[in-house]
Swiss-Prot record:
Reactions listed under catalytic activity: L-methionine(out) + ATP + H2O = L-methionine(in) + ADP + phosphate + H(+); D-methionine(out) + ATP + H2O = D-methionine(in) + ADP + phosphate + H(+)
Binding annotation for ATP: G38, Y39, S40, G41, A42, G43, K44, S45
Organism phylogeny: Bacteria, Bacillati, Bacillota, Bacilli, Bacillales
Cystine residue pairs: none
Protein name (record): Methionine import ATP-binding protein MetN 1
Main localisation: membrane
EC code(s) of this entry: 7.4.2.11
Pfam families: ABC_tran, NIL
SMART domains per UniProt: AAA, NIL
Originating organism: Bacillus cereus (strain ATCC 10987 / NRS 248)
Taxonomic superkingdom: Bacteria
GO cellular component terms given for this protein: plasma membrane
Function: Part of the ABC transporter complex MetNIQ involved in methionine import. Responsible for energy coupling to the transport system.
InterPro entries according to UniProt: AAA+_ATPase, ABC_transporter-like_ATP-bd, ABC_transporter-like_CS, ACT-like_dom_sf, MetN_ABC, MetN_ABC_transporter-like, NIL_domain, P-loop_NTPase
Quaternary assembly: The complex is composed of two ATP-binding proteins (MetN), two transmembrane proteins (MetI) and a solute-binding protein (MetQ).
Length: 346
């Protein structure tokens, strides 16, 4: 559906060239929600703007729906862009016209008939649950409602791809969740492919199927959201994953506890259950675990939990207990054994 091949972007400034996007390749499958996450300056905005050629890449190919956009004429590109919708952090609504006109006007400019425009405006305003506000002006809407209008406007061209450029970053947490639920609904009911960028792990875990992590203009890690959460490799990825959990254990406390046992992280997903398995391990082996911190968060279609425990007992018994937990499908990290590297949390 979307393929970037060795795409780079260099900006020329008074101080010289700035490589905002290094040679990058990635694929987005038809019908999936693909997220790109990174801190400010990572290059994610440049990347997503290259997808529809709002930014023309310095090198590489952008292939959408089997078309290489970098080879198209201006007229051909304009036509191809009609199948690529985009929503932004700032909504970009016309303040002097109604909600209805904000959606209808771009359709008129595209040469859509009046009957078809009326049909589409009603259809997509109903999908975003704003049909009753069709005669309202943007100034009368909340931030979340404005973003819903922007989504309806993007969908009214009936694109096959929807690009989301930090669409929820200006919204409060509750409104963000409602917009994410709407995007997930659109993806599942309409089948539209969504490529989004964000700096918030909550966005990735709630609706994405796969994710790419960016830093300094390059993709440093990518995979399914499940794999990224359960087995992050790059230091930046680990920071994002840890940000989804509230666990912060002071380093001096960790060092003190490590003199009387091991600090271990237990991660479990889906049907695996950390606490019951831990209770069974306590009965089977001579170990004495104390839960220091725990949290369960929701990925797109399943729960993911993490427990940080202090486990006391003889080393052999601890090893046997940790091996048992792994056999139950629980990911074990930390400690002084071969179950994983010692991990500091904080």
């Amino acid at each position: 559906m979307i393929e970037l091949k060795n795409v780079s972007k260099v900006f020329t400034t008074k101080k010289g060239n700035v490589e905002a996007l290094k040679s990058t390749s990635l694929q987005v499958k038809k019908g999936e929600v693909f997220g790109i996450i990174g801190y400010s300056g990572a290059g994610k905005s440049t990347l997503i703007r290259c997808v529809n050629l709002l930014e023309k890449p310095t090198t590489g190919n952008i292939i959408v729906n089997s078309q290489d956009l970098t080879t198209l004429s201006a007229k051909e590109l304009a036509k191809a862009r009609q199948k690529i919708g985009m929503i932004f952090q700032g909504f970009n609504l016309l303040k002097t016209v109604t909600v209805y006109e904000n959606i209808a006007l771009p359709l008129r400019l595209a040469g859509i008939s009046k009957v078809e425009i009326e049909k589409r405006v009603e259809k997509y305003l109903r999908i975003v649950d704003l049909f009753t506000r069709k005669d309202a002006y943007p100034s009368e809407l909340s931030g979340g409602q404005k973003q819903r209008v922007a989504i309806a406007r993007a969908l009214s061209h009936e694109p096959e791809v929807l690009l989301s450029d930090e669409a929820t970053s200006a919204l409060d947490p509750e409104t963000t969740d409602s917009i994410l639920d709407l995007l997930l609904k659109i993806n599942e009911e309409i089948g539209i492919t969504i490529l989004l960028i964000t700096h918030e792990m909550n966005v990735i875990q709630r609706i994405c199927d796969r994710v790419a992590v960016m830093e300094h203009g390059a993709v440093v890690e990518s995979g399914t959201v499940k794999d990224i959460f359960t087995n992050p490799q790059h230091v930046t990825t680990k920071k994002f994953v840890n940000s989804a959990f509230a666990a912060k254990i002071p380093e001096d406390v960790q060092k003190e506890l490590q003199t009387t046992g091991e600090i271990v992280t237990l991660s479990f997903i889906g049907n695996s259950s950390g606490e019951p398995a831990l209770a069974v391990a306590t009965k089977r082996f001579q170990v004495y675990p104390n839960i220091l911190s725990g949290n369960i968060t929701q990925l797109k279609h399943e729960a993911y939990g993490k427990l940080i425990i202090h486990m006391q007992g003889e080393q052999n018994e601890i090893n046997r207990a940790l091996s048992f937990l792994q056999e139950q499908g629980i990911i074990v990290e930390g400690g002084r054994t071969d179950h994983g590297k010692q991990v500091l949390f904080g």
